[in-house]
From Swiss-Prot:
Keyword Phosphoprotein: no
Family per record: Belongs to the sodium channel auxiliary subunit SCN3B (TC 8.A.17) family.
Cytoplasmic side: 179-215
Description of how the protein assembles with itself and partners: A voltage-gated sodium (Nav) channel consists of an ion-conducting pore-forming alpha subunit functional on its own that is regulated by one or more beta subunits. Forms homodimers and homotrimers. SCN3B is non-covalently associated with alpha subunits and induces the formation of alpha subunit oligomers, including trimers. Interacts with SCN5A/Nav1.5; regulatory subunit of SCN5A/Nav1.5. Interacts with SCN7A/Nav2.1; probable regulatory subunit of SCN7A/Nav2.1. Interacts with SCN10A; regulatory subunit of SCN10A/Nav1.8.
Membrane topology, as annotated: Single-pass type I membrane protein
Function as written in the Swiss-Prot or TrEMBL entry: Regulatory subunit of multiple voltage-gated sodium (Nav) channels directly mediating the depolarization of excitable membranes. Navs, also called VGSCs (voltage-gated sodium channels) or VDSCs (voltage-dependent sodium channels), operate by switching between closed and open conformations depending on the voltage difference across the membrane. In the open conformation they allow Na(+) ions to selectively pass through the pore, along their electrochemical gradient.
One MF term in the entry's GO annotations: sodium channel inhibitor activity
Membrane-crossing segments per the record: 157-178
Cysteines joined through disulfide linkages: 26-48, 45-120
Protein name stated in the entry: Sodium channel regulatory subunit beta-3
SUPFAM superfamilies: Immunoglobulin (SSF48726)
Amino acid sequence: MPAFNRLFPLVSLVLIYWASVCFPVCVEVPSETEAVQGNPMKLRCISCMKREEVEATTVVEWFYRPEGGKDFLIYEYRNGHQEVESPFQGRLQWNGSKDLQDVSITVLNVTLNDSGLYTCNVSREFEFEAHRPFVKTTRLIPLRVTEEAGEDFTSVVSEIMMYILLVFLTLWLLIEMIYCYRKVSKAEEAAQENASDYLAIPSENKENSAVPVEE
């Protein structure tokens, strides 16, 4: 069961990828909010366009706010992705899609100081013949960095339930074995008693015990 819980997110992503390849759709999947120190962390930001065939000028801005601090720019996409001067410089990697519906970034070698609030701003200016509407979307990602990977609560509950089920099945099988053993033992004892009683009867009594046949 824990293995299924660990494989379920992977299977879901595979299905989403397969659907996106077979059918061009956009799915706004929320980002994970927990990272482990020293590992890369993908900050997922997806902003779907309802009409993909419409051309649009897209600008992406990533901000970071430490606990008790203020927002400051760490990454910008404007006619090409570029990293700005910040404490994250050299550790950010563009992970977006070509159509700029997925504008995610990856933080390399995550540290404990990277905990905080990340903001993804996506600004689009659509190019229609009559007008050029402007749309802005915002995604907030509260990130918590830990020293070691924590155990998933669902996996813990699944493991506990699995062990309880195994104990219950073991006890049930043990009770069934004891019940069957006693039942067989009683049947053997009854058979032995009947055989002993039959052997204890004298031969004369055995002949007399026969029922006479009336003429």
